Amino acid sequence: VQPVAAPALFEEGPWIDELADPEEIFTDRIDDTDNAREHIQTLAPDLIVGSSFVADDQRYPLLSDIAPTVTFEDAAGDTPAGSWETVTTLLGTVTGRGERATEIIEETHAAIEQAAADHPVPDGATVTFAGRYAADQVIAAVNDDHSGLRFLSALGLGVADLSGEGASVAGGRAELSLENLDLLDRADLVIMGDFGGDLQEDLESQSLYQSLDAVREDRVVVLDLALTTALNTPTPLNIPPLIEELGPVLDRLAA
């Protein structure tokens, strides 16, 4: 299967380099504009793979009129992709590689199980996965309907409870004002996603953030944009780099 295009904002991650040159794989980038459909049509794809964002009544008919279109949707609607197992199975089916998809799922499960054995965490240890999406707001995933938290749960971590005063919880996420950052201290491990720009750097300069027990006790890990994207939507390709990054962090919890 030869990919011909990807969204303009698609963060492919260094793990794709192991397969091929990303510039050769993604020869076109699609902007989310009124001309996107025409751009896709000129590429004459045999298959269109989209997130749940293209599954609405307006976008889906426009794309499926060009080529067969498959989308992924989390059961809770909390992420733009379903579980990585579901995604892998579906892609294996539509490309005629179902057996290989099953093998990949089994291999990835084995890698996760090995990581959990190599980096055991204390019973009851909890995690939160958060990111500063706006100048005045941090958003944290709060249940394991989120694909990334399901992966972290498989490593033995529970999901920290951030509900209560100071957190607006909806759609599987908690919106925290900067004044309520101390809610992050409910987690034994805080994983912060850096979504680019100066938002994370500015957050780290603020006294309230610096005063968090998790920060002072070195229980915070900040992921770059590629790994943040990976944890938001884990796949068999990006799970090994996530394990490599998070393994030493899990070891610190057990120390």
Indicate where each model-derived feature is located.
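Alpha-helical, coiled-coil/dimerization segments enriched in small aliphatic residues
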Residues: F10, A141-R173, L227
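Extracytoplasmic ligand-binding site segments that recognize negatively charged/polar headgroups
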Residues: E11-P14, D56-Q58, E73-L90, G124-R150, ...
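Proline-aspartate-enriched helix->loop->beta-strand connector
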Residues: I40-G50, P68, L181, R186-V190
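Hydrophobic beta-strand scaffold residues
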Residues: P3, T69-V70, V159
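Extracytoplasmic substrate-binding proteins
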Residues: D65-A135, N232-A255
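Structured C-terminal subdomain patch of bacterial secreted/periplasmic proteins
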Residues: L184-A255
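Ligand-binding pocket segment of bilobal, Venus flytrap-like solute-binding proteins
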Residues: D118-H119, D123, R132-A135, I139, ...
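A short, structured surface patch at a secondary-structure boundary
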Residues: V1-Q41, I48, S52
